[in-house]
């Protein structure tokens, strides 16, 4: 034990240091700290970091106090902390209108300010005069508000302040998709005011959300009304994005020392210890110097070469700051604190000694931490040539309050005055600890007793919804509406949480609302918004994905409880049995494992003691919040209609329902629809009102009327049997079929009025007697085109029965009959949108995957590079899809599937930066045409009629890069649907050898071999000779000639002979797939960066990628990769794009040679053209015809597209010869001669 005198003396010394270097800047009225005596503004982030030393010293005094003076000193210091935190709270509460607006817009103009007036708590600069949007600063405030409250400080006083803090939670919970200016306030490192997604902001928001969740802001004096609620799905979004970004800091910064604050104290936001170590090592190796760490590479702040009269940099100017970036001592304080938390005494000692050596001695010998160390102006060139050799000079603020505070705090920790747990009472430091395996509790509930009896026949005993009363079961969308009430405050005009989708983490908790227990079904089972939940196989697939997600992402005390409802839509078509996919899934759940997840199947009553509970007391009767505060509360837009209610019949008795029950029933009833259309006839084939020929001719005759109306004129028309005679291809694949088949004349006519126009009233009368789904669709489509969606049909004399209502009912019937083409088309007419569309899009963008919708080129192909509001995103998709509304709906579907895969299998997207949805759809249709041996028109029809499960499966095989085949399957006899059934299977050695299954893998292997061979430029040119001479030699076992037009065959290493006919089209298809999904070899962008330093640029399809980009961007920046992609994506043909990538990879081999320059602008197109000509010459020389077919758009031989990368006739051979020939022309003095 240290003696009182020694510890007291040391603490008094720190108290003097705190007073003279930090508290002397504190305003006595507001409690805010000014940045310095010259700069009177108070930065939010700096204020919080600067007060940490005061907070820590107060706790140290309280722990070591055995005199009243020490206790008084501790109280004084703690109140200084409270005063500052409340001062920041007052600054933010004065901008409450911005908090309310930002929740909906996420606009930089609506953000809280980053700095305030120290004396008045007012703003100091305009909304657009500073990079105010800094999510990490607001998150840091919430994080330490939680930590300090948990330590015993009372900072929040009233329920109005509690409501404001709850809305700050909503403010930061979207951090995973908000591009901000980051902790250095500059955004993109060009300092041009461009916001970007920053890992430091995402990580700090994640930590704040986790820390403040379920925290009582009144501390020991509070109740349930002062508890803050956070939805776990928002936290997990941040976690997922953070994992995908690190160690990269942002789009323009490949590494940033600010990441220390999220991988260690104070955030501890990263749960993967390996990722923590990788990020830390990246910072040390790339940013650390003799005086601290530079903030990021090519940081020009306060360097001698920075122009202080200019706010922004020129892009090419960033190269000037290389190797002379200023070094900041503050980052060494992070390493000291990190060493204390991790128990690394060596790290603590090393960095304490290093920091002591660069501190500045002030008056009376006090130690001051300077802001930064800069290179002297007269030694810039010397430092640039020999980094870390020049002695630097201190610049900026002395002391730097942020660094000074962390220096004092680190000293208190290192010397034992504070324990790690005292400044981390919420135990954030254990984030990397091993978590126990999660067991997901699954309860299966039958919608009614009929379904319950059907399950019992199969030996599955479950409860019905009525059996678990008084526990209430509600769909997940009800929980979204309930949470929309959270945080409302009329005094401050706060509306609460915006209505948003709640994920499976949120619906896997049990909720206590007004002393009633509620369980909510996951939203993927909700059929009210989009048609994915109408496919039972898709529901089962989503259940598998969500169970695995729960096992991986559940962090709460207790087990997750997933309620899986079995509704009447999960029965067979005749309703006599349970759908086989659903039944087999229940069997797997009974085994205890499903999709790799540990599960426990049981009744809900068995899980009540082991589940996690959330108490939503903001809906208690004594709260000010009213459920029905306006007439339109809880209503749905027309796109949410359906006749599948499902949950209404088993709720509490009407007489005993309170306001909450009435509110829930109001929400449920708003999505229900009455039935107006006549029931369908089971034998639909014999009950058509119109013949196919008559309907075809007459529907075409009214199309002209659609042009004058404000409705889409859709050349694709309805995907029904009636209209299939004239349906055209979706412009996805080439079709040899004529656009419109000629139909014979007939005397039949649509019912006409006296003016010769279609009599819509008589059409409605015919609709009453129409019992065929296809005919009902035809009639409603004609009414939609002529009269519009809002026209009142007065069907059966009932007022208010609009065309849109009837289409909604038809949508439900089509879902029951699994008519997927019709479902997608009606979804387009009703402008239905996936509820999670914006979220899915954001997931992809946050994983650094840009999106395009529509077919190339621009401007028809729309680029999505930043998150968009749902309405704006839907509008953009429909615009990009042109007049084809089914493609617009399918685009939404594909985006959702891609988001599922990027979360569950991110490895599928390695080296993909831009996902081009239009090309992906095109490739899917092409694959169907190839595999099913049908025309483009038939393939397009088949694609639109695929079930969601089959569509997702087809997409997965395309993304996986594996060879696969598609076959037609026999549909069960009892099925009434006309949609085609296909089966997708991987292709083994039939048609492709194992070593050649993935073209890009073979290309990578070839690159490695050639890299070893091309150690010098002379060696490189000699390969051109060798390749030329070997073209006529006998083929080895690794030779591949799928392109051979002479009919010769090759054999694999196993001796199995594969005919050219069997393998024809294999590599063309492989290149088309890789080009469509923009897949490139690993390390491709870094190699392009290197080759650009040896030439003036690369010309691709008429567009130049200049070498000047390397002066702005570093090789590992996402920003550079996106720039390269933007040039490559100018090429509309995916297979040609992939050949260009292969040619560039050959070129980049020169970056490893001793050649200092390879000329001016290199035209990659010419190299590919030369390679194709060399290929043609060799083919002719071995007996092929000299009129081999060429691609009209590019002039490349079709057989060259279809050549494997390797082998004597492989594309690599010819591209290598072409590069050698091309560079020989550019470099005539190289001393190499081609023969």
UniProtKB/Swiss-Prot annotation:
Single Gene Ontology MF annotation: phosphorylase kinase activity
Modification Phosphoserine occurs at: 695, 729, 735, 983, 1015, 1044
Residues lipid-modified (S-farnesyl cysteine): 1232
InterPro entries per the UniProt record, alphabetical: 6-hairpin_glycosidase_sf, 6hp_glycosidase-like_sf, GH15-like, KPBA/B_C, PHK_A/B_su
GO CC, one annotated term: cytosol
Pfam family, one: KPBB_C
Outcome recorded upon mutating residue 299 to G: In GSD9A; type 2
Start and end residues of each stretch annotated as Calmodulin-binding: 807-837, 1059-1099
Tissue-wise expression: Predominantly expressed in liver and other non-muscle tissues.
Biased composition (Low complexity): 972-985, 1028-1053
Effect seen on changing residue 1207 to W: In GSD9A; type 1
Modulation of this protein's activity: By phosphorylation of various serine residues and by calcium.
Region of interest: Disordered: 972-998, 1028-1060
Pathway named in the protein's UniProt entry: Glycan biosynthesis; glycogen metabolism
Protein's job: Phosphorylase b kinase catalyzes the phosphorylation of serine in certain substrates, including troponin I. The alpha chain may bind calmodulin.
Disease implicated: Glycogen storage disease 9A: A metabolic disorder resulting in a mild liver glycogenosis with clinical symptoms that include hepatomegaly, growth retardation, muscle weakness, elevation of glutamate-pyruvate transaminase and glutamate-oxaloacetate transaminase, hypercholesterolemia, hypertriglyceridemia, and fasting hyperketosis. Two subtypes are known: type 1 or classic type with no phosphorylase kinase activity in liver or erythrocytes, and type 2 or variant type with no phosphorylase kinase activity in liver, but normal activity in erythrocytes.
Subunit field text: Hexadecamer of 4 heterotetramers, each composed of alpha, beta, gamma, and delta subunits. Alpha (PHKA1 or PHKA2) and beta (PHKB) are regulatory subunits, gamma (PHKG1 or PHKG2) is the catalytic subunit, and delta is calmodulin.
Family label: Belongs to the phosphorylase b kinase regulatory chain family.
Protein name per UniProt: Phosphorylase b kinase regulatory subunit alpha, liver isoform
Lineage, broadest ranks: Eukaryota, Metazoa, Chordata, Craniata, Vertebrata
Gene: PHKA2
């Amino acid at each position: 034990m240290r003696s009182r005198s020694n510890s007291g003396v040391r603490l008094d010394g720190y108290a003097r240091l705190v007073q003279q270097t930090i508290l002397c800047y504190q305003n006595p009225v507001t409690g805010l700290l000014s940045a310095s005596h010259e700069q009177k503004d108070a930065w939010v982030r700096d204020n919080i970091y600067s007060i940490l030393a005061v907070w820590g010293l107060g706790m140290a005094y309280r722990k070591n106090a055995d005199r009243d003076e020490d206790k008084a000193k501790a109280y004084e210091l703690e109140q200084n902390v409270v005063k500052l935190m409340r001062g920041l709270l007052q600054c933010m509460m004065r901008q409450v209108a911005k908090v309310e607006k930002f929740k909906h817009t996420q606009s930089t103009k609506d953000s809280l300010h980053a700095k305030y007036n120290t004396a008045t708590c007012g703003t100091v600069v305009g909304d657009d005069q500073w990079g105010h949007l800094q999510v990490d600063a607001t998150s840091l405030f919430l994080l330490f508000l939680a930590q300090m409250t948990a330590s015993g400080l009372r900072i929040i006083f009233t329920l109005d302040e509690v409501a404001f803090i709850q809305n700050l939670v909503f403010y930061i919970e979207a951090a995973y998709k908000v591009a901000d200016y980051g902790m250095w306030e500059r955004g993109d490192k060009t300092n041009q005011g461009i916001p970007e997604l920053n890992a430091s902001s995402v990580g700090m928001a994640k930590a704040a959300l986790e820390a403040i969740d379920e925290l009582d802001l009144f501390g020991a004096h509070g109740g349930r009304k002062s508890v803050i609620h956070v939805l776990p799905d928002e936290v997990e979004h941040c976690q997922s994005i953070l994992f995908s970004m690190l160690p990269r800091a942002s789009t323009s910064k490949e590494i940033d020392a600010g990441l220390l604050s999220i991988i260690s104290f104070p955030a501890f936001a990263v749960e993967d210890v390996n990722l923590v170590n990788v990020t830390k090592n990246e910072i040390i190796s790339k940013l650390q110097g003799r005086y601290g760490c530079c903030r990021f590479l090519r940081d020009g702040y306060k360097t001698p070469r920075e122009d202080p009269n200019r706010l922004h940099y020129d892009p090419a100017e960033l190269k000037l700051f290389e190797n002379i970036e200023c070094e900041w001592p503050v980052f060494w304080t992070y390493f000291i604190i990190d060493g204390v938390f991790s128990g690394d005494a060596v790290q603590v000692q090393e960095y304490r000694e290093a920091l002591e050596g660069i501190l500045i001695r002030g008056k009376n010998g006090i130690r001051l931490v300077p802001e930064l160390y800069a290179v002297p102006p007269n030694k810039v060139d010397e430092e640039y040539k020999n980094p870390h050799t020049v002695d630097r000079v201190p610049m900026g603020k002395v002391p730097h309050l942020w660094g000074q505070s962390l220096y004092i705090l680190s000293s208190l920790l290192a010397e034992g005055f504070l324990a790690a747990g005292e400044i981390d009472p919420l135990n954030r430091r254990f984030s990397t600890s091993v978590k126990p395996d999660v067991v997901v509790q699954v309860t299966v509930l039958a919608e009614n007793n009929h379904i319950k009896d059907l399950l019992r026949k199969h030996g599955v005993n479950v409860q019905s919804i009525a059996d678990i009363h008084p526990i209430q079961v509600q769909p997940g969308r009800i929980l979204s509406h309930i949470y929309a009430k959270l945080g409302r405050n009329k005094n401050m005009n706060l509306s609460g949480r915006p209505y948003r989708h709640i994920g499976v983490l949120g619906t896997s908790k049990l909720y206590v609302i007004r002393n009633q227990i509620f369980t909510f079904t996951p939203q993927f089972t909700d059929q009210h918004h989009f048609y994915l939940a109408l496919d039972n196989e898709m529901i089962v697939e989503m259940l598998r994905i969500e169970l695995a997600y729960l096992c991986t992402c559940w962090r709460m005390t207790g087990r997750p409880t997933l309620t899986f409802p079995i509704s009447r839509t999960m029965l067979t078509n005749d309703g006599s049995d349970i759908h086989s996919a659903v039944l087999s899934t229940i069997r797997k759940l009974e085994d205890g494992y499903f999709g790799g997840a540990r599960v426990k199947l049981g009744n809900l009553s068995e899980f009540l003691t082991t589940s996690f509970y959330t108490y939503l007391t903001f809906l208690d009767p004594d709260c000010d919040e009213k459920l029905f505060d306006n007439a339109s509360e809880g209503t749905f837009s027309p796109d949410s209609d359906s006749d599948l209610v499902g949950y209404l019949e088993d709720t509490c008795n009407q007489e005993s329902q309170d306001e909450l029950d009435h509110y829930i029933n109001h929400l449920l009833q708003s999505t229900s629809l009455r039935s107006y259309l006549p029931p369908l006839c089971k034998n639909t084939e014999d009950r058509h009102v119109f013949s196919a020929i008559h309907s075809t001719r007459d529907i075409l005759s009214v199309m002209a009327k659609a042009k004058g109306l404000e409705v889409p004129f859709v050349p694709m028309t309805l995907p029904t049997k009636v209209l299939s005679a004239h349906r055209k291809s979706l412009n996805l694949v080439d079709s040899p079929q004529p656009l419109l088949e000629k139909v014979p004349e007939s005397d039949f006519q649509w019912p006409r009025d006296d003016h010769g126009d279609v009599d819509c009233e008589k059409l409605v009368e015919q609709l009453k007697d129409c019992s065929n789904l296809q005919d009902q669709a035809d009639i409603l489509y004609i009414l939609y085109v002529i009269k519009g969606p809002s026209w009142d049909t007065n069907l059966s004399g009932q007022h208010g029965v609009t065309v849109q209502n009837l289409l909604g009912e038809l949508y439900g019937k089509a879902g029951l009959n699994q008519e997927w083409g019709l479902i997608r088309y009606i979804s387009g007419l009703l402008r239905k949108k996936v509820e999670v569309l914006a979220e899915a899009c954001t997931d992809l963008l946050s994983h650094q995957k840009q999106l395009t919708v529509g077919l190339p080129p621009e401007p028809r192909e729309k680029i999505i590079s930043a998150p968009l509001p749902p309405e704006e995103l839907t509008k953009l998709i429909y615009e990009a899809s042109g007049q084809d509304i089914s493609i617009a709906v399918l685009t939404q579907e594909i985006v959702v599937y891609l988001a599922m895969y990027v979360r569950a299998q991110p490895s599928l997207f390695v080296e993909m930066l831009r996902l081009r949805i239009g090309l992906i759809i095109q490739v899917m249709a092409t694959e169907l045409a190839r595999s099913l041996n049908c025309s483009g028109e038939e393939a397009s029809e088949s694609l639109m009629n695929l079930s969601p499960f089959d569509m997702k499966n087809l997409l997965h095989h395309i993304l996986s890069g594996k060879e696969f085949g598609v076959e037609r399957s026999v549909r069960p006899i009892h099925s009434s649907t006309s949609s085609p059934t296909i089966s997708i299977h991987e292709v083994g050695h039939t048609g492709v050898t194992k070593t050649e299954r993935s073209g890009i893998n073979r290309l990578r292997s070839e690159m490695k071999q050639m890299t070893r061979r091309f150690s010098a430029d002379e060696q490189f040119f000699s390969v051109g000779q060798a390749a030329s001479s070997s073209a006529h030699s006998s083929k080895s076992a690794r030779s591949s000639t799928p392109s051979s037009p002479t009919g010769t065959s090759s054999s694999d290493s196993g001796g199995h002979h594969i005919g050219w006919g069997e393998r024809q089209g294999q590599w063309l298809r492989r290149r088309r797939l890789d080009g469509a999904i923009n897949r490139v070899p690993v390390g491709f962008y870094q190699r392009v960066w290197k080759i650009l330093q040896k030439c003036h640029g690369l010309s691709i399809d008429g567009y130049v990628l200049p070498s000047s980009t390397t002066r702005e961007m570093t090789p590992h920046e996402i920003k550079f990769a996106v720039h390269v992609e933007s040039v490559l994506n100018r090429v509309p043909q995916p297979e040609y794009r992939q050949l260009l990538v292969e040619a560039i990879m050959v070129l980049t081999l020169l970056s490893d040679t001793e050649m200092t320059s390879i000329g001016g602008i290199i035209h990659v197109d010419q190299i590919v053209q030369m390679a194709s000509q060399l290929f043609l010459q060799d083919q002719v020389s071995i007996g092929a015809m000299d009129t081999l077919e060429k691609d009209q758009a590019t002039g490349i031989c079709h057989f060259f597209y279809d050549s494997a990368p390797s082998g004597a006739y492989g594309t690599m051979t010819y591209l290598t010869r072409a590069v050698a020939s091309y560079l020989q022309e550019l470099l005539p003095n190289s001393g190499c001669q081609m023969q």
